[in-house]
């Protein structure tokens, strides 16, 4: 439609991950190291999904690159529709003061000014208006279902551009009447949310403004139709998602053999860390060293997933198999970092003034809310964490003293307050013992969560010191486990091939690096 092609973008309010079912059969080979070693050592997988190849690099054509891009785009869109219940298309308006916004406004206004001058000329010129009605007719017809023949015939009859041109040649065309018919038809086809827009159209007197607003409302109706289609498609897509994603990724892999390089490095990093941990355990005095240490594929893969909760999403590229969930994982990681700090602050407060404030749950709840509010946006580059932690410390002292005074008890002395604020501010320092303790306990909880069958019928026990964030951590953990379990179902065969290569072929030839991990 003329000058009204608003840019479409993806609306993603809050991610809502679908519950994933149990591992697919192809993932069963990862369930335990004790399963048949021979099956892992075999070379039954397709060569295109192997993490390494000895053949020379193949020249990739432009068409192959474009085919891969289309497959990746389709895979990403299908995944987003299936797992994000809030996914919808929205119109993104350009900022009014931006150059693009000003240019768009000027060009649009110029078009409608020309149309206004043509319709008010003597004699009037109708050619541009007729073209607009022709486009309106096609849009209205696109809303009809295959069975809507009666309305289809009526629209084609009333908005017959050949007939309208003949009427225009004899100055007998009724532009206002045609516009009224269009508005009436739009009222029959639109969603209830557009009823108010239709009423406003009927109340508009200027014919040029009516046509302008008709196109605006038609744009909204097209967006409504697209979102309705997405909503209708979602249940079917959810049922077919695992097979669809796996097939699409296999197509990408066939076009781009290097499409698993980052994934291989991600898993290899976990293998090296586990081997180093086992080698250190073997050197511990009194440890039995009767046989060569073995790694469980499930343990390696779960540890790889745990690394995603400490991923530097700004500097480090995600594994290819997790690209579709990158935004969700980043959001969970950022939220988890906030929960870690809240747990640290609560633990410090309990250690220092718990004896004084014990039995005051309303105070603990208020302090937690204050911390959560002040820590909002802590993952932004402009956020000064040390300054905010200092502010939380000061506010904590104020709230504690206020509560003590209300109960006629002595307030905290200056030394305790300074110590409390200092410990709060030191949380961000490297190797802080409180942070390390909370981080270790959260990792333990998440590791236990990944070991549960999917879907989770009950949550694992909450480690000590995390009660203050239990509700939020359980919700976050459930979302995280859903992402991981669905990812395992989809990409299980690819992970099996990589682990088969890393844990058996390379281990047998002594190729796995057991040096200390660098990060």
From Swiss-Prot:
Description of how the protein assembles with itself and partners: Interacts with FMNL2; this interaction promotes muscle-derived satellite cell (MDSC) migration and differentiation.
Superkingdom of origin: Eukaryota
Function: Promotes the migration of muscle-derived satellite cells (MDSCs) during differentiation throught interaction with FMNL2 and therefore may participate in microfilament assembly.
GO cellular component entries: cytoplasm; cytoskeleton
Family: Belongs to the TCP11 family.
InterPro entries from the UniProt entry: Tcp11
Gene that this sequence comes from: TCP11L2
Region (Disordered): 1-30
GO biological process, one term: muscle cell migration
Keywords recorded for this protein, A-Z: Cytoplasm, Cytoskeleton, Phosphoprotein
PANTHER family linked: T-COMPLEX PROTEIN 11-LIKE PROTEIN 2 (PTHR12832:SF17), TESTIS-SPECIFIC PROTEIN PBS13 T-COMPLEX 11 (PTHR12832)
Protein name: T-complex protein 11-like protein 2
Modified residues (Phosphoserine): 16
Biased composition (Low complexity): 17-29
Primary localization: cytoplasm
Pfam families listed in its UniProt record: Tcp11 (PF05794)
Localization, UniProt: Cytoplasm, Cytoskeleton
């Amino acid at each position: 439609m003329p000058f009204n092609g608003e840019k479409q973008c993806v609306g993603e309010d809050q991610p809502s991950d679908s519950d994933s079912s149990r591992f697919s059969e192809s993932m069963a080979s990862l369930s335990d190291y004790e399963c048949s070693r021979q099956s892992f050592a075999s070379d039954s997988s397709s060569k295109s999904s192997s993490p390494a190849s000895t053949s020379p690099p193949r020249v990739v054509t432009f068409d192959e690159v474009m085919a891969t891009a289309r497959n990746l785009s389709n895979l990403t869109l299908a995944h987003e529709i299936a797992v994000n219940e809030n996914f919808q298309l929205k119109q993104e308006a350009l900022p009014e003061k931006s150059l693009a916004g000003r240019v768009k406004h000027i060009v649009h206004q110029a078009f409608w000014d020309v149309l206004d001058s043509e319709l008010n000329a003597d004699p009037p010129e109708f050619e541009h208006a007729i073209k607009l009605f022709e486009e309106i007719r096609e849009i209205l017809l696109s809303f009809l279902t295959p069975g809507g023949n009666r309305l289809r015939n009526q629209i084609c009859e009333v908005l017959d551009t050949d007939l309208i041109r003949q009427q225009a040649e004899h100055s007998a065309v009724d532009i206002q009447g045609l516009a009224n018919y269009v508005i009436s038809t739009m009222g029959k086809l639109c969603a209830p949310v557009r009823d108010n827009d239709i009423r406003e159209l009927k109340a508009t007197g200027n014919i040029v403004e009516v046509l302008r607003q008709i196109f605006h409302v038609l744009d909204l109706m097209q967006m409504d139709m697209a979102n309705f289609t997405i909503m209708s498609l979602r249940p079917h897509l959810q049922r077919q998602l695992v097979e669809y994603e796996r097939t699409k990724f296999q197509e990408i892999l066939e076009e781009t053999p290097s499409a698993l390089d980052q994934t291989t490095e991600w898993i290899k990093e976990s293998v090296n860390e586990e081997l180093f941990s086992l080698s250190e355990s073997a050197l511990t005095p009194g440890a039995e060293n009767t046989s060569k240490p073995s790694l469980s594929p499930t343990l390696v893969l779960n540890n790889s997933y745990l690394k995603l909760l400490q991923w530097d999403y700004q500097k480090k590229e995600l594994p290819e198999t997790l690209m579709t969930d990158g935004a969700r994982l980043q959001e969970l990681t950022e939220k988890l970092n906030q929960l870690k700090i809240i747990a640290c602050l609560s633990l410090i407060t309990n250690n220092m003034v718990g004896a004084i404030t014990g039995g005051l749950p309303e105070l603990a709840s208020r302090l937690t809310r204050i911390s959560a509010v002040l820590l909002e946006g802590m993952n932004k580059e402009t956020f000064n964490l040390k300054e905010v932690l200092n502010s939380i410390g000061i506010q904590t002292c104020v709230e504690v003293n206020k509560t003590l005074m209300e109960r006629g008890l002595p307030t905290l002395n200056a030394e305790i307050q300074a110590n409390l604020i200092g410990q709060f501010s030191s949380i961000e320092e490297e190797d802080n013992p409180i942070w390390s303790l909370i981080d270790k306990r959260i990792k333990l909880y998440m590791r236990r969560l990944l070991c549960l069958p999917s879907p989770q019928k009950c949550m694992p026990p909450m480690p000590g010191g995390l009660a203050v964030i239990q509700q939020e951590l359980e919700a976050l953990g459930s979302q995280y486990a859903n992402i991981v379990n669905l990812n395992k179902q989809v990409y299980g065969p690819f992970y099996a091939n990589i682990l088969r290569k890393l844990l058996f072929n390379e281990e047998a030839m002594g190729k796995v690096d057991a040096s200390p991990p660098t990060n």
